[in-house]
């Protein structure tokens, strides 16, 4: 592989590791000319998969488009780059497991949302607000209420108790 620093055509692999359950191979390389080290990632190239959008148009599957959307939703959130990469890998695995030549954008969006909901709730709401194209604040509120209800159920509380507690805490700070 060509060195990205001096462009010498020969490098040595000094370390190889499997990442994300073998989905990706990370290689540390060293240039034979300048001695600089750099990292490369190897993954299976996705087949010619087409995404069917809501309006019926088709476009080639683009892993990077999913990654950009997730990174945007996670902007300034405590979510690591590795966690984002893992999420994108999981979505891509789900997409490829369908073994279809065409897949709906809804399938991809839903797969991202399911994983984001568990990863970071604020990122989930951010992504949902774009993906679901909320027409008004009421629809956004419904999504937040749904998330709060799910969180309350997971913690063994009703959503009303969670909301009341949050309200009490907010008033006690004033």
From Swiss-Prot:
Disulfide linkage: none
Entry keywords, A to Z: ATP-binding, DNA-binding, Metal-binding, Nucleotide-binding, Repressor, Transcription, Transcription regulation, Zinc, Zinc-finger
Residue numbers spanned by region Disordered: 151-174
Keyword Zinc-finger: yes
Domain ATP-cone: 49-139
Zinc finger extent (unnamed): 3-34
Pfam assignment, any one: Zn_ribbon_NrdR
Cofactor, how bound (note): Binds 1 zinc ion.
Compositional bias per record (Polar residues), positions renumbered to this chain: 155-174
GO terms of molecular function: ATP binding; DNA binding; zinc ion binding
UniProt cross-references to InterPro entries, sorted A to Z: ATP-cone_dom, NrdR-like_N, RNR_NrdR-like
Cofactor(s) in the UniProt record: Zn(2+)
Protein's GO biological process: negative regulation of DNA-templated transcription
Family, similarity comment: Belongs to the NrdR family.
Stated role: Negatively regulates transcription of bacterial ribonucleotide reductase nrd genes and operons by binding to NrdR-boxes.
NCBIfam families membership: transcriptional regulator NrdR
HAMAP family: NrdR (MF_00440)
Record's protein name: Transcriptional repressor NrdR
């Amino acid at each position: 592989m060509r060195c990205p620093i001096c462009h010498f055509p020969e490098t040595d692999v000094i370390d190889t590791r499997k990442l994300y359950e073998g989905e990706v191979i990370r290689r540390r390389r060293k240039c034979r000319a300048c001695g600089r080290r750099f990292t490369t990632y190897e993954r299976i190239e996705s087949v010619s998969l087409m995404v069917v959008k809501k309006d019926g148009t088709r476009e080639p599957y683009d892993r990077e488009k999913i990654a950009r959307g997730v990174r945007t939703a996670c902007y300034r959130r405590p979510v690591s780059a590795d966690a984002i990469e893992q999420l994108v890998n999981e979505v891509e695995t789900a997409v490829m497991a369908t073994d279809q030549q065409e897949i709906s954008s809804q399938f991809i969006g839903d797969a991202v949302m399911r994983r984001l909901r568990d990863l970071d709730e604020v990122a989930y709401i951010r992504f949902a607000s774009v993906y679901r194209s909320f027409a008004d604040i009421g629809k956004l509120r419904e999504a937040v209420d749904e998330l709060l209800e799910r969180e309350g159920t997971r913690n063994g509380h009703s959503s009303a108790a969670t909301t009341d507690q949050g309200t009490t805490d907010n008033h006690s700070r004033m």
